[in-house]
């Protein structure tokens, strides 16, 4: 498998995920098994739901391969610090600290950050990196990518693909 940052043929997708179309469709059909370990944790205003993915499922390997051979090769903004190797929590503050000359900052947290990344938004982003001239084939690749990445139209925290996708 080779590292790519743009998909130009349907075969590029299958090369980077390490399986054929039939195996991919079977893995997608078994999504409920992959995401089957849902844990509900009580919090102040309800529950926080976390999925414990089944690493024995084929979809786990497909997501890891997609990250390694495709999504992880896409250049991300210099302003994206989340989940980057060799970056810690305070790295994103450094340029603000140096520019403004003080160490005061406001920390905000996005409620359900991964779940807030919509299927429509992700589809638009992926469309940019799928460079196939024939509309039907391009749509098929983007649909497969969304099927690999999302569960119930949401990006799920705890999957090997969520951190990489959230920085796109």
Regions found by a protein language model. Name each.
Residues 58-107, 163-167:
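Active-site-proximal segment of RNA-dependent polymerases
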């Amino acid at each position: 498998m080779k590292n790519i940052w743009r998909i130009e043929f349907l075969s590029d997708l299958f090369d980077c995920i390490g399986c054929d179309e039939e195996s991919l469709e079977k893995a997608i059909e078994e999504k409920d098994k992959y995401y089957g370990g849902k844990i509900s944790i009580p919090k102040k205003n309800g529950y926080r739901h976390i999925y414990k993915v089944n690493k024995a499922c084929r979809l786990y390997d497909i997501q890891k391969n997609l990250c390694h051979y495709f999504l992880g090769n896409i250049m991300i903004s210099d302003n994206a610090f989340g989940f980057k190797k060799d970056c810690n929590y305070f790295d994103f503050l450094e340029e603000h600290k140096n520019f403004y000359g003080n160490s005061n900052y406001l920390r905000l947290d996005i409620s359900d950050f991964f779940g807030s990344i919509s299927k429509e938004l992700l589809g638009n982003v992926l469309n940019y990196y799928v460079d196939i001239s024939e509309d039907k084939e391009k749509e098929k690749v983007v649909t497969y990518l969304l099927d690999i990445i999302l569960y119930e139209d949401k990006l799920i925290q705890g999957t090997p693909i969520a951190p990489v996708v959230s920085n796109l």
